[in-house]
Amino acid sequence: MFKEVFSYRSHVAALVRLLVLSLILTQIPLFNYLGYEFSAAVALCWSFMAGLLTISLWKKSGQGQQPGTKQFIYRSLILGLVPLFIPFLIICLNAFFVKNCSFLGGSILFLLIVLPAVLFSQALAFFLAVWIRRWEKTAFFLSWFIVLFHILYVTFTGAQIFAFNPLLGYFAGLTYDESLEVADRLLLYRMGTLAFTLLMVMAAQYLHERHWPGEGAIQTPPGSSRRGIIFALSIVVALLFFFSNDLGLSSSESHIKKTLGGQAETEHFVISYPDTLLKGARLAQIVQLHEFYYVQLSRALRVRTTRKIHTFLYASAEQKGRLIGAAGTNLAKPWLWQLHINIGDIDASLKHELVHVFAADFGFPLIRVGINSGLIEGLAVAVERIEYEEPVHRLAALVVQNKLAPDVEGLFSLTGFMKAPAGASYVVAGSFCRYLIDRYGMRRFKMLYRTGEFTILYGKPLPMLVREWRRFLGGFYFNGGDRAKAEYLFKRRSIFGKECARVIANVNKESRELLAQRRYEEALVSTDRSLEHSMSVDAAFQKTTALLRLGRYTEAVKFAESNLADSARAASFLTLRVLLGDAFWALDSVESALKVHAEILRTHLSVSWDEALSLRLEILLRPDLARTLKPYYVSLNEDSARVALLERIVRAEPDEPVTMFLLARERIAHEKFDEAIQLLDAVPAMKSPILELARQRRLGQLSLALGRYERAKVYFWQSLNHVYRDSQALEIEERLKFCEWMTTAGEQVN
């Protein structure tokens, strides 16, 4: 039977195509090992070919002129499934050249994605061959693409960006999230796929039986048994369809609203939010922040929206990932007038995502977005003007001067932006778009956003405009700390350049959760498992943290120093030095700890990092205080013990500003804002300008959170006296404007 099935020239040609496809995939990063991407590519290509071959086999074997179908089904299964050994064996052999981090996990995905896709496609072809009898391949071609089009339909017309599909299995959406944990839901969905596949086969058999009503036409169970099987299969399909929201196989807008629970409405927005998390003043401020940015963006982009924008706020990345996908990526769907944001990212992401929706007014028709991702994301960053707490032009100059910039012209092609590392791409595109807007005006840029025609609109080709922009950036000058910061932020590979990216991301996520649960021994085992696959920044940081929390300080020092000694990756491990400094501190090597922390501080990674490092330096410069607070930083793992230590010190030394500052931070972490304000107000002016800025900013933020807007303005005004970066002044001035907005607009939530 094998020889007969593969004796046709078209069948042999299909096997050759499958072989060539498999070999090509071994040369493409991310597709070159047994994982999701490889399985998805094989599923799409071979399911299409297997369907056409099934129709060909039906016609060439003269099956339409014979009564039975059992032999044909067996031969079809051989034709569709046996060739799958080709890609499976090739990708397994490729493991000798490309690391395969999880053979078992990859095999499970291959089984769940590829096999059901091929069986579904063959059943569809079988049904069409029996039912239509003419133009069968054309009908299959159209039907196959309609089924695949379901992915676009679901992700384009609904809130979710993921989709379960009979042919692809699972589509994760266009997102920067590397973690992919879908096997349990995919298994459930594939049960439905196989049930529907069997229903199509039985329907085809029934149609063929009607054509050949004679004895022995079909070897299937008796009528009552067949009806029972059909009923059972139909129940499976129906249950998965009607309960798909609850099972995590889909997520309708109504289901998302119901899950979140809360809804507020303003003149320009409908805001769905987690009612268990957002209440009172915080809810009112988030609602008004929408209107505050609406006014800003209306002026900046010269646009007024024609309908209300719907914002969905999620309690956590996990909730967002479960409901729409893209757990760690905030996103906008301009064509639906929707934003999807994790509540913890609202201050950092709301304005950026709103720009995408506003830009829909002058975007490409129907989909209402820019002509390419470089213009889409570049405009959003250009309007914000700040990225990584730096003015966007300064940061872009830093990227360019350190030769870390991606191909700038390529960023404005159809796919170039997605291929490049995300961090540098956003900065470079944002700076370039800001330059075009400032130099040539918003009106011309809005036309560019829709068309992508640089030469027509600016009278200059893109390469010439890029050279102009590079000359503009030439006026910035940087020190060694700036260069170290640039290498840390941007000397990173995209997902296509990483080994076993998804497997490692899943393991690192597990390690992060174990650390949060203070299960340090288990976290250490998990990080070692990740590091066995490949060295990554996250895993190295997590392992060092686990070693510190377990009191294994010497091991922590050796591990951190071994990674920092490698010049090729030392820049990426910059923040690992903080843990190295803490480990030195734990070993009473105060001088080494001071040196390490001071070295990181000169990079000024962010306001929060500057605050954390300045506090450490203040403490380490005072031996008595360093001994007293050492347990707080390196050995006390329980929050209650850490707080108790600080409270004892504050009672014993009520005039010690550092411990009062630390205790205030603990009060903030436990949402005891009034107590935190009392402590910070009682702290005398800090000698360090970084810490004094942090104190005043925190007082302003706390007063704002409590709805004390006039008082918040005072603190923010005072903090302007201590800024040491241009971006800090811009951020504080934005807070001042929002306080003024809240004072005049009030806290009205419909």
What is the role of each PLM region?
Residues 1-58:
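Hydrophobic alpha-helical transmembrane segments
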Residues 30-39, 86-110, 141-192:
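Membrane-interfacial interhelical loops
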Residues 34, 75-135:
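Secretory targeting signals
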Residues 35-82, 89:
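Helix-loop-helix units of permease transmembrane domains in multi-pass membrane transporters
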Residues 36-42, 254-372, 383-391, 398-408, ...:
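Juxtacatalytic substrate-recognition/specificity segment
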Residues 150-194, 211, 224, 231-244, ...:
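Beta/coil-rich, acidic/histidine-enriched accessory regions frequently appended to metallopeptidases
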Residues 193-230:
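Cytosolic-side transmembrane helix boundary signature
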Residues 235-259:
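Hydrophobic alpha-helical transmembrane segments in integral membrane proteins
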